[in-house]
Amino acid sequence: MRFCKKCVMPDTKPDLHFDEEGVCDACRSQEAKNQNINWQEREKEFFELIKKYKKHPVYDCVIGVSGGKDSTFQVVKMLELGLNPLCVCFEPSVPTKIGRKNLDNLNHLGVDLIHIKRDPKVYQKLAREAFIRTGDNEWQNHLGIFTSVPRIAVNFGVPLIIWGESPQIEYGGPASSKNKNILGREWLEEFGGLLGNRASDMLGVNGIAEKDLFLYTYPSDEELQRVGVTGLFLGYYFKWDYKKILEISKKYGFLTLDHPVETTYENFENLDCYSNHVHDYLKYCKYGFGRATDNACLDIRLGYISREEGVRLVQKYDGKPPKKAIKKYLEFSGFSEEEFQKIVDSFTNKKIFKRDENGKFLRDYDGSLVRKDECVLK
């Protein structure tokens, strides 16, 4: 297991590549953001692009929102540019009180908001089956977010969708994907986290019918072409710095916690849903890195902390089971603690974590998995 020489990301991250100097492509991408990209030209390109979309009689664009810092910033930015966005929130798996406050705050910025309250029975069936199949407790929610937004765009006849950061630019990925400014079906299937499991694969599971999957199914090419739907990454056109975005969002009423969230050292991540913290923990079990690593890597690349400090933060915060979030998730999903742990263990990486003579994973005093010596971050 190798770690990037500049940040602290391991080579187990899917689609991440290291060069001959041992530096990951996400770090190289950050260098390009600072040195090779003319952001003024890209901003001009965006301003010219949106002119043709400011013709809709009511809404100029659709924005998928959670009430988080990024979606708050997206709404603020579009309002500043004189656009009238229609906002769409696909209900989180296990909503939080602060998340609801932030969503209400976003609404009160002066936008119409469609809050999709999905059928809880169908949703739970999808959640349970997807977790068993993929080891991803948020598969159904990520799918719902990425399909319901274009569905609303099609049904309301609004051709422009505004997404936030470009994950491949910020977190690394194939070189060809970094120059893509559009989120469409191709991006969803390659990078949307479906893990080889499509909505259609759930047909018939515990009585799930085709009509139950409507919100989880991407609009047809014919529908998209009829409206001319295009989904753009705002992070392709504007230089993305999450701390600056956070400060702007706080200025417009975004709330943070007075303590770190369970899976990292920050107090503003994934505030809308408890289940997201379980998702971060599962990522750690599969790939050996979690949300604290993600945050530390961004902070290192943006120059906010040193790599040495990043190592310290990752060692302190990454990999600890989010006990409160797991409890909330079990109440929502109906899994027992034993069932949950059995599924987690089935997806836990045997190449990274130690096991005893019976094949059982070793755990620390706080329940954290014990890493093999060659997989310890230094």
Kindly label every feature range from the protein language model.
Residues 1-61, 77-378:
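Nucleotide-activated chemistry modules centered on ATP-dependent adenylation/adenylyltransferase
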Residues 61-70:
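Short, glycine-rich nucleotide/cofactor-binding loops
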